[in-house]
A protein has these predicted regions:
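Short alpha-helix boundary/capping motifs
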Residues: 63, 70-71, 133, 152-153, ...
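Bilayer-spanning, highly hydrophobic alpha-helical transmembrane segments
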Residues: 7-17, 138-165
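Membrane-interface, cytosolic juxtamembrane amphipathic helix immediately N-terminal to a transmembrane helix
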Residues: 99, 113-154
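Glycine- and small-hydrophobic-enriched helix-loop-helix hairpins
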Residues: 50-117
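Hydrophobic packing residues in well-ordered alpha-helices of helical domains and bundles
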Residues: 32-35, 105, 124
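N-terminal hydrophobic targeting signals that begin at the initiator methionine
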Residues: 1-3
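Juxtamembrane/interface alpha-helical elements of multi-pass membrane proteins
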Residues: 6-77
Length: 165
């Protein structure tokens, strides 16, 4: 009876760890998807509506939830007080992003608003093209690796239970 109880607990722990792994990939995809949505809003706001950058950003923050929105809010606070590169890069230091994604976001938001209209628009379109590739890869990772981790966690838990029984 004790072995069965321990096996059940270990099965639960293993399945829970698998779900946490899946959650990581889901949240990473959501974060990058939110950034892509912001990027599209930014391109539309700059090219068609001719809005200013803080207005576009505050409009996005008001209509969105999630970690990217919170990081964007921190970015607005930092931009209004100072423009130090180190503080800007800390705004987008999410545990769900890879190092290359963090560096990319830091570079993007540091350079945002520092160019003339045409250059800024071409950089945004280039960023949009790169982000589409990254988003496709993140979605693929979410569907394959994330789902695999949750199933593998449950399967490992059942295997532990069988071994202990």
């Amino acid at each position: 009876m004790l072995k069965l109880a321990i096996g059940g607990i270990l099965c639960f722990i293993s399945a829970y760890l698998g779900i946490i792994g899946k959650s990581y990939y889901d949240k990473r995809y959501r974060y990058l998807s939110d950034f892509n949505d912001f990027l599209l809003l930014l391109i539309d706001g700059i090219s068609y509506a001719k809005d200013r950058l803080p207005e576009i950003t505050k409009k996005y923050i008001a209509s969105s939830k999630g970690e990217f929105s919170r990081n964007l809010n921190n970015y607005i606070v930092v931009i209004e007080s100072t423009q130090e590169k180190e503080k800007i890069s800390k705004c987008f230091d999410s545990k769900y992003l890879k190092k290359i994604d963090k560096a990319y976001l830091s570079e993007f938001f540091t350079a945002l608003g520092k160019f003339d209209y045409d250059t800024q628009l071409s950089r945004l379109n280039l960023c949009k093209a790169e982000m589409e590739k990254t988003l496709i890869k993140a979605e693929k990772d979410c569907k394959s690796t994330g789902n695999l981790l949750s199933k593998l966690g449950l399967l490992l838990g059942i295997a532990i239970m069988i071994i202990l029984a």
